[in-house]
Amino acid sequence: MRAVLLPGSGEQPTAFCYQVNGSCPRTVHPLAIQVVIYLACAVGVLITVLGNLFVVFAVSYFKVLHTPTNFLLLSLALADMLLGLLVLPLSTVRSVESCWFFGDFLCRLHTYLDTLFCLTSIFHLCFISIDRHCAICDPLLYPSKFTVRTALRYIVAGWGIPAAYTAFFLYTDVVERALSQWLEEMPCVGSCQLLFNKFWGWLNFPAFFVPCLIMISLYLKIFVVATRQAQQIRTLSQSLAGAVKRERKAAKTLGIAVGIYLVCWLPFTVDTLVDSLLNFITPPLVFDIFIWFAYFNSACNPIIYVFSYRWFRKALKLLLSREIFSPRTPTVDLYHD
């Protein structure tokens, strides 16, 4: 890092990330503020990793949870956990220091993993919406239509498509050669902002909003059908009524998860598009807040499950007790007392 005096800046020095031409300016925070931000980010990373790790463990360990919907939840939790484990620590340093100090290779890998895990999350939420739509709107055909094999196909697509899509933009020069007029503005040295250009702003918008529109339309239909079922539930047998209520409860919980996802990611996605039209005028601090608000979503789902799913709370209680070592624990029925 170096400090220089800019013309007209008086005595206020400007810091840079590297002692080279084209280096990014660096915002130097007081030590106390740095410590507070590092601690806050560390807590967020810890909640993200441990919360989603428990979801992965619970669905894998308890046999009663081996359902198509829960396998999708497991895969979603895995993406969020890996985001917290592999992406957020380096993002924390970049946010606090306002510079990237880990080299070009890690910059590209970090950007790849960041985009991969975030796109994987939205794909999985979209597939979960399809699952809930089928369970609520077509309950008689649901067991035969949405099997474990179907869920596994969705999981492969949910990871494979984002992996190929992101690799195409980051690890080939096809896009840069074909769209050079869109990519003239190169990031300064020390920013690690490989994808934030005008073309990516336009491309990122439909990648977010098309799945969102699908999810919103599916949940609107689910709401209409669930309301009708609530009026008819008195005429059903007790066992069938219980099954319908359980499916509606799951749809409601996952609908909340989708809603929180939209709220967390909407500011960043809209800003990316608008910023590309206005020649990137968003202050770095505001942009960083939008990014971390989106990251925060990865910590939300386990918290939602704690308040919404009795089986999740029961599994957590077993995990924190000696009963977890009992050979009978994996076969415990978490849905009933």
Curated annotation (Swiss-Prot):
Summary of the tissues where the protein is detected: Specifically expressed in neurons of the olfactory epithelium, to discrete glomeruli predominantly localized to a confined bulb region. Present in the dorsal area of the main olfactory epithelium. Also present in the limbic brain areas receiving projection from the olfactory system and involved in the regulation of emotions. Also expressed in some brain regions outside the olfactory epithelium, such as the hippocampus, cerebellum, cortex, raphe nuclei, hypothalamus, and habenula.
Residues bearing glycans: 21
Record family assignment: Belongs to the G-protein coupled receptor 1 family.
Regulation of its activity: Inhibited by 1-[(5,5- diphenyloxolan-2-yl)methyl]-4-(2-methoxyphenyl)piperazine and N-[(2,2-diphenyl-1,3-dioxolan-4-yl)methyl]-2-(2- methoxyphenoxy)ethan-1-amine small molecules.
Name the record gives this protein: Trace amine-associated receptor 5
Primary location recorded for the protein, binned into one broad class: membrane
Residue numbers on the Extracellular membrane side: 1-38, 92-109, 176-204, 275-284
Pfam families recorded: 7tm_1
UniProt comment concerning the protein's domains: In addition to the well known disulfide bond common to G-protein coupled receptor 1 family, trace amine-associated receptors (TAARs) contain an unique disulfide bond (Cys-24-Cys-188) connecting the N-terminus to the extracellular Loop 2 (ECL2), which is required for agonist-induced receptor activation.
Function: Olfactory receptor specific for trimethylamine, a trace amine enriched in the urine of male mice, playing a role in social behavior. Also activated by N-methylpiperidine. Trimethylamine is present at high concentration in the urine of male mice after puberty and acts as an attractant. Trimethylamine-binding causes a conformation change that triggers signaling via G(s)-class of G alpha proteins (GNAL or GNAS). Also required to provide olfactory input into limbic brain areas to regulate emotional behaviors likely via modulation of the serotonin system.
Lineage per the UniProt record: Eukaryota, Metazoa, Chordata, Craniata, Vertebrata
Phenotype upon changing residue 118 to A: Does not affect trace-amine receptor activity
Region (Extracellular Loop 2 (ECL2)): 176-189
One function term, GO molecular function aspect: trace-amine receptor activity
Reported impact of residue 257 to I/L: Decreased activation of GNAL/G(olf) G alpha protein in response to trace amine-binding without affecting activation of G(s) G alpha proteins
